[in-house]
Every structure is written in C-alpha cells, then in structure tokens.
C-alpha cells in the first residue's frame, strides 16, 4: 500500500512538473507551440488540392496534394512537369485560392497557362535574378499567410549569386545544395503554420560512373528529398495520334514518396497539346477499370447507351455532356473510396477565415 501511495505521489509530482513546463513553453513561444494529440487541436484531416488528374488524386491516397507541405515534381524534359503544376494552379483558383509562380527559368508561357484554365490576371508572377532572391520572395509570400499555393520553376534554375557574379569556368561545389538546405530549414515551419502548399519543379541529371542502380538524380542536393512530403516522378511513355498527327503524350506519374498515404502508386493519363490533362480520357479509363463504363470491341457504353466508337469519340462525347462525365466521375470516386468532387472547398474556406 505504501509503495502504491509513493508511486501515486511521484506521478502527481511528475504531472505537476509537466504542467509547469508546458505552461512555460506556451508563455515563451505562444499558444499551440506544444499540445497533446488527444486534445483534438491537431488536425487529423489533411486538407488537399486536386492535381487536375483524377487518377493521380486517387494514387496520392488523400484526393490531391496536401496543403501546408512541400511537394517535389521531377522528370525529364517535356514530360509534363509545368503542365501538371499549372493544372494545380487552375484547381486552386477555382476554389478562390491565391497562387504565385516563381519563374526562375524565365520560360512561363502565359497563353498556354490560360488555355489550361489558369486565371493569369490573378496569378502572381516573379522572375528573379538569383536563387537567393527567388527563395527570399518565396519566404516573404509564405510568411504573409495570404498565399495558398507557390510554384518554384525550377530548382535547377535557382543559381546562387556567387555563381552569377563569378567567371564561367569557376568551380563552386555544393553552393546550390547549401542554398536549398538553408532555405528549406527556414521555410518548412512557416509553410505548415500558414497552410500554404509549395511545389518545387526539378530536373533530372545523370550521375557519372554508376555501375548498379539508377544513375538518375535530381538537382539541388538532398535537402529537398528529405523535406518534401510528396515526391512525384513524371514521365512521357508514348504519343497520342489522330491520323498521322501527334496530338498529345501518354504520361505516367509515380508517387515516389508520400508522408500522408502509402507511396509507390502510379497514375496514367493523357496530356493533350494546348488542352492539358485529358479529364474525359481518365474518366473513360478509370470507368472501364471500375466496370462503370462498358467496353465492347472499340465501342464504349454507359448505362446501356453507346457513347462513342474509339477513345477519341468517347472523350468528345463526355466533353459535350459534362453532366454525364461528372456522374461517371463521382461513381468512379465512390467505387475507389475517394471523396466526391471539390475536396478543397473547406481548405480554402479555412484560409479565408484565418
């Protein structure tokens, strides 16, 4: 009995000491700087923004890209990296979010962006001279708490000031990696607090002398690999033809890293030139997989009614009948256990209230 009383006394003292420590931390660093998971103040539901691709939203496991996180999208040239990020911008703008595009490559095509559904009049754009300037602008925008999405295009173009001011042949090893590491250390906490989604577009390089495993690596050192909650590897795997003309690319995206859901899932979709990701094409493919759309030979049918011979005609039918496309999409989402359309309405509303 005495041992139990002594144990209870020690436990009460520990609780008292813990309460005093928590009180001191909150006094010094502000309310919410430390909390119990069971108190319900920590968000369990992850707020997301759609990628514009139904298949990729499903592969991500939470219905889109998570807000308040860092995301990296990388792949070879002309694989669809900028197209995918511009689609995310369009989706965020549909929900009333404010977006910024840090164009370090100085290569943003405004006409193409508007064709993808981006409201270019409301898009904030910066074309910085140095990597430091680009990341300082990003930091200032994130800290403002009024930006929902920031795109940095691309990490490879974030050239340190010392390199720009130096001579062509100067050897400056590790400068860019140090710049990225410092910036991400500074940014991550603020990104989480302000619920801003920051997407880094990255390029691929080849490591020399690799005998085993993949020789591919991304630029800017290893920091981004660690800090990113989601990493997407995007590749062009084929061409889409209409007669003899190539009208788009068949694209594969692999979720290489995912801190919010199981990783290593893949999504396949079409990117049509001048139109972006073919939503209707995805609805057809996923509808066939889920047995919601029937395929017999070259014909596609829905509810016993033929909607087109060949994928191109079926895609055109769904473009002309958006109600049927939305109906099939919601059935596909229900079959795969993904939230019905507009998964980020609540997320944007929360930002507006803040």
UniProtKB/Swiss-Prot annotation:
Keywords: ATP-binding, Cytoplasm, DNA damage, DNA recombination, DNA repair, DNA-binding, Nucleotide-binding, SOS response
Pfam families: RecA, RecA_C
Keyword Membrane on entry: no
Official protein name in the record: Protein RecA
CDD domains linked to this entry: RecA
Chief location category: cytoplasm
Its biological purpose: Can catalyze the hydrolysis of ATP in the presence of single-stranded DNA, the ATP-dependent uptake of single-stranded DNA by duplex DNA, and the ATP-dependent hybridization of homologous single-stranded DNAs. It interacts with LexA causing its activation and leading to its autocatalytic cleavage.
Family designation: Belongs to the RecA family.
Recorded GO MF terms: ATP binding; ATP hydrolysis activity; ATP-dependent DNA damage sensor activity; damaged DNA binding; single-stranded DNA binding
Naturally occurring in which organism (per UniProt): Cupriavidus taiwanensis (strain DSM 17343 / BCRC 17206 / CCUG 44338 / CIP 107171 / LMG 19424 / R1)
Localization per record: Cytoplasm
One of the GO biological process terms: DNA repair
InterPro entries: AAA+_ATPase, DNA_recomb/repair_RecA, DNA_recomb/repair_RecA_CS, P-loop_NTPase, RecA-like_C, RecA-like_N, RecA_ATP-bd, RecA_C_sf
UniProt-listed Gene3D superfamilies: P-loop containing nucleotide triphosphate hydrolases
NCBIfam families attached to this UniProt entry: tigrfam_recA
SUPFAM superfamilies, per the entry: P-loop containing nucleoside triphosphate hydrolases, RecA protein, C-terminal domain
Entry binding sites for ATP: 75-82
One Gene Ontology cellular component: cytosol
């Amino acid at each position: 009995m005495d041992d139990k009383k002594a144990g209870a006394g020690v436990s009460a003292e520990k609780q008292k000491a813990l309460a005093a420590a928590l009180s001191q931390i909150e006094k010094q660093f502000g309310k919410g700087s430390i909390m119990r998971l069971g108190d319900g103040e920590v968000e369990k539901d992850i707020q997301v923004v759609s990628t514009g691709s139904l298949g990729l939203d499903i592969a991500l496991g939470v219905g889109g890209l998570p807000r308040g996180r860092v995301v990296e999208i990388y792949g070879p040239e002309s694989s669809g990296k900028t197209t995918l990020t511009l689609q995310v911008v369009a989706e965020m703008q549909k929900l009333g979010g404010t977006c910024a595009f840090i164009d370090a490559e100085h290569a943003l095509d405004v006409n193409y962006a508007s064709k993808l559904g981006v409201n270019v009049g409301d898009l904030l754009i910066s074309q910085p001279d140095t990597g430091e300037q680009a990341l300082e602008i990003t930091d200032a925008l994130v800290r403002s708490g009024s930006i929902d999405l920031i795109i940095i295009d691309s990490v490879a173009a974030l050239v340190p000031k010392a390199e720009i001011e130096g001579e062509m042949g100067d050897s400056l090893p590790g400068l860019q990696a140090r710049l990225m590491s410092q910036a991400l250390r500074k940014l991550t906490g603020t990104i989480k607090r302000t619920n801003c989604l920051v997407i880094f577009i990255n390029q691929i390089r080849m490591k020399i002398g690799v005998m085993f495993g993949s020789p591919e690596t991304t630029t800017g050192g290893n920091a981004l690999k660690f800090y990113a909650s989601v990493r997407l590897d995007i590749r062009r795997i084929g061409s889409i033809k209409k007669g003899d003309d190539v009208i788009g690319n068949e694209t594969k995206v692999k979720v290489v890293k995912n801190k919010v859901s199981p990783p290593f899932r893949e999504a396949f979709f079409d990117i049509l030139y001048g139109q972006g990701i073919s939503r209707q094409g995805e609805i057809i493919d996923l509808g066939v997989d889920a047995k919601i759309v029937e395929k017999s030979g070259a014909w596609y049918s829905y509810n016993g009614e033929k909607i087109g011979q060949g994928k191109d005609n079926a895609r055109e039918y769904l473009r002309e009948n958006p109600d049927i496309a939305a109906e099939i999409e919601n059935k596909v989402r229900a079959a795969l256990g993904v939230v019905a359309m507009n998964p980020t309405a609540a997320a944007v509303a929360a930002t507006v209230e803040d």
